[in-house]
Amino acid sequence: MSKVEESIEVGVPVHTAYNQWTQFETFPQFMSGVERIEQRTDTLTHWVTSVNGVHKEFDAEITEQIPDERVAWTTVGGEAEQAGVVTFHRLDDDHTKVMLQMDFHPDSVTEKVGDKLGFVKRQTKGDLERFKKFIEERGQETGGWRGAVI
């Protein structure tokens, strides 16, 4: 298993950052390589990704979700093996630190080489930077799910 940890400060309140992160179907607008996400149930999403010519489909189960604090997931079945958590830390009324931690298993030779060269870390950093731009330009979330999964 490989690991990646990245964080970014966003200029919105913690509830705004959290609410936007729960809108999984908007991820393709700021995550490179994510083609589509379907929210199938409150705790199950279906992902279609394509990174450097490697196409994958998989389901991710939300294993823990606490409003304004964290969203944790693990993949179930499909073509990807990963687990992670995104946490939200209030810095002040208008700023939030978003931290992403993920464990993943690179399968193909392309994925293994990309992992060794730091591609996943750079991609994650870029995704968080695009999330920052996405939410700050709007100033508000596109929606939000406030339920808890424990």
Curated annotation (Swiss-Prot):
CDD domains: SRPBCC_8 (cd07817). InterPro entries: COQ10_START, ORF3, START-like_dom_sf. It holds the Pfam family Polyketide_cyc. It comes from the Bacteria. This is Uncharacterized 17.2 kDa protein in melC2-rnhH intergenic region.
